[in-house]
Amino acid sequence: MMLSNFGSYNRFFVKCMDGSLGLQELPDNSVKLVYGSPPYPNAVRDYGTWRSKDYVKRIAPFIDAAKVKLREDGFLVINVKACREKHGSKMNSTRSLVVEKLAILMEEEWALHCVDIEVWVKSNPVTTGLRVACQDAYEQILWFAKSNPWSINLDAIRRSYSETSLKTYDSSYYKPRSNGLTYVRKQKKIQPNPLGALPKNVVSGPVSSKRVKHQAVQPEYLPNKYILATTNEGDLVVDPWMGTGTTGVEALKLGRLFAGFDVVQEYVNIAEKRLAEVPMVLKLDNTGV
């Protein structure tokens, strides 16, 4: 299938290849969201090891390609975990700042706009046996927009109000200022939003327990949030580090199109099977993307 016609008759396209090259095969300005979790710094995996000293250099081709392929209203979201650096047997390991460096470069070198740097707090982190710092229980999510101003679907990711918040609303009022310059001239009760509370920039939940042949399977709720927040039905979502296809499964469930790439053929085969099993939500036509 020609990628230039992607979306005409297919909900998804996956291929075993380097994701930066896969992105280059997509039409320019066609992608609404590039979401993915690249290899973590220094993590030894069957799909390779990206050393922290070379990390920015390794990820640069992906960001270069993403910027060209993203629509002007598109977003790039990267979930990545920092690592600890070893400094010899007589010194303590230190936390690497490579993720922070990457975030700064995404703004300064790639001229992307930081929507937020969110945090994924894991309720069941893997025990590391670390004795020189606290248990590592979070990962960072670098959320950037191609253009500013940007628009996100906050209503799609609102959350339920806590009992404490609802009690606060019951006793809270807008009070008029004595100078009369505020738009509230009379005392007025504050009402909670009927769609729910504003989403937090902290995502909490367990690490995926799915029995899939992959060393770092994403939980569904992570890509789900950013797909809902940044895309609409029929938009194209791309994961250049697809793994076994969790991002794609969530995209298809929500009626989006999906393209994914991975360098391990076994993962691509698993992803293709999982994606094919997702029930049809989006009605396709022959317009393409």
Model-based region annotation:
Residues 1-9, 272-287:
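Short, conserved SAM-binding/catalytic segment
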Residues 154-158, 282-289:
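Short, flexible loop/turn segments with low-complexity composition
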Residues 1-270:
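Core catalytic lobe of class I
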